[in-house]
A protein has these predicted regions:
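N-terminal secretory signal peptides
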Residues: 1-46, 69
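Active-site/ligand-binding neighborhood in enzyme catalytic cores
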Residues: 20, 31, 204-309, 313-317, ...
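N-terminal export signals
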Residues: 40, 46-72
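N-terminal Rossmann-like FAD-binding beta1-loop-alpha1 element of flavoenzymes
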Residues: 77-104
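Glycine-rich FAD pyrophosphate-binding loop
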Residues: 96-118
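Dinucleotide-binding Rossmann-like beta1-alpha1 core, especially the glycine-rich loop
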Residues: 123-197
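Core beta-strand elements of the Rossmann-like FAD/NAD(P) dinucleotide-binding domain
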Residues: 324-332
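C-terminal segments that line or cap access tunnels to active or ligand-binding sites in enzymes
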Residues: 341-467
Length: 524
């Protein structure tokens, strides 16, 4: 089961699970049941889900194409890593610790990929995450790297924050409570659960089961079950922000898998309160992790190296051609760049199977963007809110400077959009979103300090998208083929992860696991 990365979707997941539980506890009045569950939720904050997909290794191991080209015993293989984002850097980091040489080729003039922390962008003494922002409790790769690099973490679930209301749902010009969301789910809970339970245990390109759901969009599914009104709008907003593409093009399996109320079918336990908690940030900026890795690996990185072609000669190995630079040869190749960029590389002379070509060519990518604005103070906190806002035109809004400077003085606020809204978001939209924030938290607009920044990852020439997203037909057409190696060709990055696809943790995880595979191969 995939994990949520957005606050709204996490809240909706929990509301749906509580609606199912309420229907199964008909002997308890609804209000009394909800109150009891809210109490349990508070008492169980430290028992968040630690899911792992143990079957993943076994499922992929059987279809990994074995190495077809060795190298001479009297020399170490030449290893090339393309991409100096977190996946490529963590791969290099583990290779270096194992005493194995390599070179990282990066198209831009910076490391870090889609992680970018900017100091003082919106307010003095603050930092703002222009890219990957939140770290879950079970993002073990990120926690381990932070510990290894002596970086401290900010806990946004600190005691001071629990005293305020976290979420403000603002739809149809009304404020909705979580209790109302649960009530709205009740008529549809059993139907959604039945559809989820009808899903096969394995759905991917090797096991193209449940094509009917895969070929149906989320919009089509909601219409099919008769779910309309403000709850349908809220769900569409949640999934557009979550995956980064409009729900009219997303596979309904994105909805059915992520909203599963019965994780026991695949993970041997029922988790009513299991969720992505988005609890941590690195103090001073998340990009300190890849920045520090880049400093450790500085003698291994070559910048301004845009890959334009990969060839695989009959004699073995790989030939990499770069724009305006000499070609290089490698025995082992790690591609740690998003498929949005890899599909621009000439691969006709690379010996890879058709399923891998389809994955590279067609995998969907979100168009998430952030509009970030500065304010003189946190008006939302004075009104009893942490600042999280959900609105038909705001897929998620939040205080991006939460807990910085003890929540005092100037601050920043992020508007997060996906789909066509994210694709087209620009600084000229600031006035529109200032008015929306004002409608939710009156008095905020007058406190705007006129500092505004934009990060549109779909328009960034080195990413051309935010993170991976399966569109209709892609679960069964190319699903989970991204990270499978082909001979001595490996893939790393968030898109190559199964459990943590779309997360920083997925990039770090795949970088490490690819390095471990190479280490075993080299030292065998």
């Amino acid at each position: 089961m995939k994990k949520s990365r957005s606050f709204l979707l996490t809240s909706l997941q929990q509301a749906f699970r509580m609606a199912l539980a309420a229907k199964e506890n008909t002997n308890i009045p609804f209000d009394e049941f909800i109150e009891s569950q809210e109490y349990q939720a508070l008492s169980r904050r430290n028992f968040l889900r630690q899911t792992t997909q143990a079957v993943t290794a076994g499922a992929t191991a059987s279809i990994i194409i074995p190495s077809i080209q060795g190298w001479a015993q009297n020399r170490m293989p030449k290893i090339a890593i393309v991409g100096a984002g977190l996946g490529g850097l963590n791969c290099g980091h583990h290779l270096k610790k194992a005493g194995i040489n390599f070179t990282i080729y990066e198209a831009s003039r910076r490391t870090n990929g889609r992680m970018m922390s900017v100091k003082g962008a919106l307010a003095g003494g603050t930092w703002t995450e222009f890219g990957g922002e939140f770290i879950d409790t079970d993002h073990t790769e990120m926690h381990q790297l932070a510990k290894e690099l002596n970086l401290l973490k900010l806990d946004v679930d600190a005691e001071s924050e629990r005293k305020l209301t976290k979420d403000l749902f603002f739809f149809d010009n009304k404020h909705y409570t979580v209790k109302q969301v649960i009530q709205e789910f009740l008529p549809f809970a059993n139907k959604i659960k039945a559809d989820q339970e009808s899903l096969s245990d394995e759905i991917d390109y090797l096991h193209p089961n449940n094509k009917d759901f895969d070929n149906l969009s989320i919009d089509g599914y909601l219409e099919k079950i008769g779910l309309t009104g403000w709850l349908a709008t809220m769900l569409k907003v949640a999934f557009t922000g979550e995956y980064g593409l409009d729900t009219g093009v997303q596979s309904s399996l994105n909805f059915l898998e992520l909203f599963s109320p019965d994780t026991g079918k695949r993970h041997n336990k029922f988790e009513l309160f299991g969720k992505s908690d988005e609890r941590y940030k690195i103090i001073g900026g998340n990009d300190q992790i890849p920045t520090k890795l880049g400093e450790i690996l500085k003698d291994h990185i070559v910048f301004d190296s845009k890959l334009v072609e990969i060839q695989e000669p009959k004699a073995g190995g790989y030939i990499l051609k770069f724009d305006g630079k000499p070609e290089i040869k490698a025995d082992i190749l790690v591609l740690a760049l998003p498929f949005t960029m890899l599909r621009e590389v000439q691969l006709k002379k690379l010996n890879i199977p058709e399923w891998k070509r389809r994955s590279i060519a067609y995998m969907g990518y979100g168009t998430n963007s952030k509009l970030m604005m500065g304010f003189q103070r946190r008006q939302w906190r004075s009104q009893g809110y942490l600042g999280f806002l959900y609105h038909p035109e705001v897929h998620t809004g939040w205080d991006n400077s939460q807990l910085q400077n003890n929540n005092e003085g100037e601050c920043g606020y992020s508007i997060f959009l996906g789909g066509e809204g994210g694709k087209n978001l620009g600084l000229n939209d600031a006035e529109k979103y200032l008015n929306i924030i004002e409608s939710a938290f009156p008095g905020t607009k007058a406190l705007h300090n006129n500092k505004r920044r934009i990060m549109n990852w779909a328009q960034n020439p080195f990413s051309k998208g935010s993170y991976s997203c399966y569109t209709t037909g892609q679960w069964t057409g190319i699903g989970f083929a991204e990270g499978i190696p082909v001979g001595n060709l490996y893939f790393a990055g968030e898109h190559a992860s199964i459990e943590f696809q779309g997360f920083m943790n997925g990039a770090a995880q795949t970088g490490r696991t690819v390095a471990e595979e190479i280490i075993k191969k080299v030292k065998a």
